[in-house]
């Protein structure tokens, strides 16, 4: 019998030679931190995402319309990089956090990966993860170079009723939504932003079909 085991400190090791750039989008100058070459061993993280079956169980995927992987591993060793980046680029937010909050967040964090394809996209509009303005979201792209397409897009709402339903999956600007920017998908790229910024997965028909799935690891911090 062979049973796979994991060394989380190795699999989720942060690459010391990561590269950071900062984008600002829209009239609110919404800040988005983009980190390339994020993991030291991204292929190990990608393989883990592929090995664990994805589920549409509502308890796992919440309001996410896609499939989701959600598994408990020790992710405490990742807290430092997020603490460093958030303090450097969002100091006014982090000044409101209690000491040790980032470490506590990663003690509770799970290995969460959204898994979706681009056919039969649901009618979905851009969303906020949390309106408080005190919390962060992070996406890490796990599609390799041959599979990467689209990205994460950001928006401003310019309509009059944000709760009005939509009839299609929104990506480009509409009468109610202005796309302010997009961070393209790239293997081992991490994207960090505030949860109160309107955003969505930038996906169009034909991007992820047959045996190709959009794979993005997700943290809500």
Regions found by a protein language model. Give the residues of each.
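Fe(II)/2-oxoglutarate oxygenase catalytic core
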Residues: 1-192, 196-221
């Amino acid at each position: 019998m062979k049973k796979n085991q994991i060394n989380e400190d190795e699999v989720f090791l942060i690459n010391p030679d990561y590269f950071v750039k900062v984008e600002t989008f829209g009239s609110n100058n919404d800040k988005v931190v983009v980190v390339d070459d994020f993991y030291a061993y991204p292929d190990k993280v990608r393989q883990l995402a592929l090995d664990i079956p994805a589920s549409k169980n509502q308890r796992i995927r919440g309001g996410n319309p896609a499939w989701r992987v959600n598994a408990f591993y020790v992710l405490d060793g990742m807290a430092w990089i997020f603490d460093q980046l958030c303090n450097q680029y969002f100091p006014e937010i982090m000044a409101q956090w209690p000491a040790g909050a980032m470490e506590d967040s990663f003690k509770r964090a799970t290995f969460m990966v959204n898994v979706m394809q681009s056919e039969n996209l649901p009618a979905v509009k851009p969303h906020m993860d949390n309106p408080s303005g005190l919390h962060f979201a992070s996406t890490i792209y796990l599609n390799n170079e041959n599979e990467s397409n689209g990205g994460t897009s950001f928006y401003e709402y310019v309509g009059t009723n944000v709760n009005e339903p939509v009839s299609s999956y929104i990506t480009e600007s509409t009468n109610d939504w202005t796309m302010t920017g997009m961070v393209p998908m790239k293997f081992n790229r991490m994207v960090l932003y505030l949860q109160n910024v309107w955003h969505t997965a930038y996906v169009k028909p034909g991007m992820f079909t047959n045996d190709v799935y959009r794979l993005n690891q997700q943290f809500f911090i």
